[in-house]
A protein has these predicted regions:
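Acyl-donor (CoA/ACP) binding surface of acyl/acetyltransferases
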Residues: 1-15, 21-26, 65-171
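Amphipathic alpha-helical segments used for helix-helix packing
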Residues: 19, 29-33, 62
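A short helix-loop-beta-strand connector motif used in the catalytic cores of GNAT acetyltransferases and
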Residues: 50-64, 74
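Intrinsic-disorder/low-complexity coil detector
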Residues: 6, 34, 38-41, 54, ...
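Conserved GNAT-fold acetyl-CoA-binding loop/helix
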Residues: 26-50
Length: 171
């Protein structure tokens, strides 16, 4: 399976919104997502439109699509971006039948290279829910170094939870 990783288009942001709004309560819990924090779809789409109206270096996020033969496999988002310094990434395989097959490792490796290039990073972090085994294994296999486990709210959709902090440092 040939995997392509590239910056997401504005039209593809609808796939992120659909992914979260269609997810089961169990899946959201595994991700550490509080369903009451999900913006309504039209509001969320407007937020993405506003983001895409700005140059990359002025955005509060950077979105990446994962594809195979033009089929959407999943996505990564970066936030807490400090251009030239650091960012935090998130990772999602959207089709449940494609999970636990090792696809995420290649997607993450290619995404890391894209983030370091476009955002001119020295450090990239990822903080998945400590009890969600899949992304933690994926990050380890993709070359991230485990830093620590701690309690935090990793993003605007999340509740307070235990997360594992992973890092790639090229500073």
């Amino acid at each position: 399976m040939a995997i392509t990783v590239r910056p997401m288009t504005l039209q593809e942001t609808a796939l992120i919104i659909e992914y979260f709004h269609a997810a089961t309560p169990e899946h959201l819990e595994m991700l550490g997502v509080d369903p009451t924090r999900l913006p309504l779809a039209p509001q969320w789409q407007r937020l993405y439109e506003q983001m895409f109206d700005r140059p990359v270096e002025q955005r509060n996020g950077f979105l990446v699509s994962w594809l195979s033969d033009d089929r959407f496999l999943g996505f990564s988002t970066a936030d807490k971006i400090r251009i030239g310094q650091q960012a935090n990434m998130h990772l999602h395989i959207t089709d449940p039948s494609l999970r636990k097959q090792g696809i995420g490792v290649e997607c993450v490796r290619k995404t890391v290279e894209l983030y370091f290039q476009v955002l001119e990073l020295k450090q990239l972090f990822c903080e998945p829910n400590a009890f969600n085994v899949a992304p933690n294994r994926t990050l380890q296999k993709a070359g991230f170094t485990y830093v620590k486990t701690h309690m935090t709210i990793p993003g605007p959709l999340n509740y307070h939870q235990a997360v594992n902090r992973w890092m790639i440092d090229r500073g």
